[in-house]
């Protein structure tokens, strides 16, 4: 029994797709366990970029099984579009499996997401408007439609009719917006269901059978710990649990079967959307990091907010997710800076604290306490070991490991698979 979980430790966009792709080379099954097509990951293979939002990174390995677990909310329209994109690029999807227990995102979820966000005005959360939150709301309210329901024509029609009647009353009465058509949604989405039914199965059985057989299973998280609905910067969070604990709920695999948790982070910090960000940069250094790091959302295209590395955030992520190994990305983006900074603690009303407050009001008053380190001028994109890094870059990497309290297993100096360097295999000693 060998399993590794890959999670984001910041606010998403840490490079999980790349690291999952890298670790997938030694895995036999790769599974997603939460989120939806609000998650975007970019994978570079042989110099070619592939952008996915829903299908796991493991799809690029035809000999491995790629799983969308029950904790994922699936937009069938987006899924079919992504399948067509992969087929056009010559990528086979025969290895894909989709949980029959996963919930379905429908047009009324997307419309409700947009209307609710618009109604918040200045208090908007910064949602991707993909219908993720409303879909999880229906799931919790026990009125959601699952993939298994989508494939059954009579059940789908019955549940869609009931749900749409309620949603249309909400649209017309509360938001004074146009109602949606039952016939249009039913015909379009039932057809999508038929297009994906070949992939649908009980994925919990597949995952547990694989683990019981001693196969290597890799669980791929979406978003990041700081966007977790319980442990993140609530309410500026997603509607699911990106933390490692979400694996067991979202995949149907018990906690005793999880061996290692790899936390993925950047050598700096980024965030899309609104919410607290203590180390955010508003100067020319921030702009430089954004441009050099191509910090624009994969899903939204929005410019990402950027800031210095925050070890307070990282220690919070380590604690609530039980992170055992760290993967440090984008070190190359910081090349050319005279000085690099790491936030080691916060100043809250004159008191030094080393924890991440739950209160948004306290977070607003938190000022980062920085440790400054000398930067490096060298181009490090060709470095293939820690020893090849310039001394200052090497010291920066080591200091991050010391402050976070997690051993660094891999570090990356560019987007390519070959630019990911192994310090310690996460598949060993399991």
Swiss-Prot record:
Highest taxon of source: Bacteria
Q: Which residues form the active site?
A: 13, 41
The residues listed in the UniProt record as binding IMP, with positions renumbered to this chain, are: 13-16, 38-41, 128, 142, 223, 238, 302
Does the record bear GTP-binding in its keywords? yes
> Which CDD domains does the entry link to?
AdSS (cd03108)
The record's keywords, sorted A to Z, are: Cytoplasm, GTP-binding, Ligase, Magnesium, Metal-binding, Nucleotide-binding, Purine biosynthesis
Query: What are the BP-aspect GO terms?
Result: 'de novo' AMP biosynthetic process; IMP metabolic process
Does this UniProt record's set of keywords contain Nucleotide-binding? Answer: yes
Function according to Swiss-Prot or TrEMBL: Plays an important role in the de novo pathway of purine nucleotide biosynthesis. Catalyzes the first committed step in the biosynthesis of AMP from IMP.
Its subunit composition reads: Homodimer.
Looking up PANTHER family in the UniProt record yields: ADENYLOSUCCINATE SYNTHETASE
Name of the protein in its database record? Adenylosuccinate synthetase
């Amino acid at each position: 029994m060998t399993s590794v979980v890959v999670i984001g430790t910041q606010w998403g966009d840490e490079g999980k797709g790349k690291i999952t792709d890298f670790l997938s080379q030694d895995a036999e099954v790769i599974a997603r366990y939460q989120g939806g097509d609000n998650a975007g990951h970019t994978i570079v293979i042989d110099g070619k970029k592939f952008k996915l939002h829903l299908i796991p990174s493991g799809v690029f390995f035809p000999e491995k099984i790629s799983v969308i677990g029950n904790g994922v909310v699936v937009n069938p329209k987006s899924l079919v579009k992504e399948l067509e994109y992969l087929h056009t690029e010559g990528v086979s999807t025969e290895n894909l499996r989709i949980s029959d227990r996963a919930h379905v995102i429908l047009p009324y979820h997307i419309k409700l997401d947009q209307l609710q966000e618009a109604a918040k005005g200045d208090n908007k959360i910064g949602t991707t408007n993909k219908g993720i939150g409303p879909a999880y709301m229906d799931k919790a309210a026990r009125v959601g439609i699952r993939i298994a329901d989508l494939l059954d024509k009579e059940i789908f029609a019955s549940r869609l009719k009931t749900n749409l009647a309620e949603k249309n009353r909400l649209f017309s009465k509360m938001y004074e917006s146009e109602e949606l058509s039952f016939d249009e949604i039913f015909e379009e989405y039932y057809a999508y269901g038929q297009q994906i039914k070949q992939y649908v199965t009980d994925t919990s059985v597949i995952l547990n059978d694989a683990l019981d057989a001693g196969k290597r299973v890799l669980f791929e998280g979406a978003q990041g710990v700081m966007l977790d609905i319980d442990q993140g910067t609530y309410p500026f969070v997603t509607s699911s649990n990106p933390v490692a604990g979400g694996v067991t709920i979202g995949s149907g695999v018990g906690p005793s079967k999880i061996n290692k948790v790899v936390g993925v982070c950047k050598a700096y910090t980024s965030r899309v959307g609104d919410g607290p960000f203590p180390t955010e940069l508003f100067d020319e250094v921030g702009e430089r990091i954004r441009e050099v790091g191509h910090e624009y959302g994969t899903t939204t295209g929005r410019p990402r907010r950027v800031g210095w590395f925050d070890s307070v955030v990282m220690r919070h992520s380590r604690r609530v997710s039980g992170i055992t190994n760290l993967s440090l990305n984008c070190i190359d983006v910081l090349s050319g800076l005279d000085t690099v900074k790491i936030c080691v603690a916060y100043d809250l009303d004159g008191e030094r604290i080393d924890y991440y407050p739950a209160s948004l009001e306290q977070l607003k008053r938190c000022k980062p306490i920085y440790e400054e380190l000398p930067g490096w001028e060298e181009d490090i994109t060709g470095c293939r070991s820690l020893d090849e890094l310039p001394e200052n870059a090497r010291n920066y990497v080591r200091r991050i490991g010391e402050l976070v309290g997690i051993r660094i297993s891999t570090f990356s100096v560019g987007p390519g698979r070959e630019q990911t360097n192994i310090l310690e295999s996460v598949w060993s000693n399991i």
